[in-house]
Amino acid sequence: VVDLVLKCISLYRTRLVAVDGGGVGGGVIDRLRQLGIPVIEVQFGSKATPHLAAHNREKARYFNKRAEIWGSCRDWLRGGALPDDPQLLEALCGPKQHIRSEDVVQLESKEDATDRMTREGITYDMDVADALCITFAIDSDLYTGVNALHNSPFDEEESPSVDYNPFAGLREAMPSVH
């Protein structure tokens, strides 16, 4: 996994890496930090970021960090783009959400969504969707100086002469995904 992350850093000139701290992610985070790679550890089950609600009281809009970053991804997709990848599309549409009594959004657990979709005859890899959504766990402006809503991560003087395609080279960089 670390080798794949290093390839992607080189290919996309990534300045920061967000890694799921659950499961085997802790070891990946430790190794990347040993190599001097800036890493943000994301715990999907941790608390969501509070926002100012009515009467200037801070209140979480989401049940946990996972629901929050999936919600941020959903909002971005209204104006963003996805690679032509049916597996990713199915995975992003997989988990159901519901509103809890305290008016916070909760996503169906990864395990429950996978079980339900399998019973319905749909198989997909939820890790693919989590990989996209985890990119919304950090404020890209804060760490990269790049506004995530702009088309290119390049500075004006180093901007390429062709249109920026964030998915160019993706299949070559990650052949094991397809």
Could you tell me what each predicted segment is?
Residues V1-V104, D155-H178:
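Mg2+-dependent endonuclease catalytic cores in nucleic-acid-processing enzymes, primarily RNase H-like
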Residues C93-H178:
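Acidic two-metal-ion nuclease catalytic site recognized across multiple nuclease folds
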